[in-house]
Amino acid sequence: PGMDDPALTGRLHTSDTIMRVEELPESLVILGGGFIAAEFAHVFSSFGTKVTVVNRSDRLLRREDALIAERYTDAAARHYTLRLNQHVVALEEGTHGRLRVVTEDADGVHYGFQGDLVLCAQGRVPNGARLRVDAAGVRMDAHGLVVVDEYQRTNVPGIWALGDVSNPYQLKHVANHEERVVQHNLLHPDDLVASDRRFVPPHGVFTDPQIASVGLTEDAARAAGHDVAVAVQEYASVAYGWALNDEGHCVKLVADRATKHLLGAHIIGPQATLLIQPVIQAMSTGVDVPTMARGQYWIHPALTEVIENALLSLGIEADA
């Protein structure tokens, strides 16, 4: 049955409707392995719901750096049930009023997972075509996004676009940045400013453990031809992490040896979205690795020392 089947009303949900349920379900099956699936799995399992996550690939959050995705998948398996490498083939009535998700693995074997509710969290696709902007001559790309230039202008004079309708990074802070760009450019047509697209925008995944990322993953940096330096620093290697009795959480930095600048940062662990902010600042302002590592004080015994040590572990020295 489809999402709009009346028989499924109140039992089959999207991320919009799942937040409006009046009672906590005893069991929930979540379809998908991205950040929406991960965050809702965290929320409902924390409340005591028996959560089963069904995902097509062999790990959750596969768009994250490979190390982070691997560690998160291992951590998630300790909190709720994972069914990986499964392709959903049917959704049918189960027992006792529950829904049954039927899946198939690579060998063609079928499985069934039941839940009081099912959350479809397999991602969102752009729906800009519903705006009918083509009637005004505005161009859209093959993915359904409105095409804009670096100043957020469309191909039609006087029409601007920002946020999810034109940017593949569907993040509130990205839309906020572009809103400021558009506001400035509307008020100052002779002094246009461009949106900052120098690196992959930062984002956070608010789960347990928390995740934060900015810029290129290691694989993407190598594929782009950079002279890559990588450092992985465990939380437990610094005093604050040791005091937390931390296990399995880390900071991963990716840098270019030739330019001495950071290319990306990926963190899994407590306060990841706070820890990553100084890295975002360094990447935004052009501070290189040696300057960031040794050009400031790092408070001891704060958790930020894990960033300091990761920078030093990159092995990138200042010019003599």
Where are these regions (language model features)?
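Short acidic-glycine loop/turn motifs at beta-strand connectors
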Residues: 95, 142, 257-259
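Rossmann-like dinucleotide-binding cores of NAD(P)H-dependent redox enzymes
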Residues: 19-20, 25-29, 35-104, 108-109, ...
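Residue-level detector of anion-binding/catalytic polar loops
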Residues: 50, 81-82, 139, 227, ...
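General small-molecule cofactor/ligand-binding pocket signal
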Residues: 13, 81-83, 229-231
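FAD-site-proximal beta/loop scaffold in flavoenzymes
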Residues: 8-25, 112-192
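Flexible, glycine-rich terminal cap/loop adjacent to redox cofactors
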Residues: 206-217, 222-320
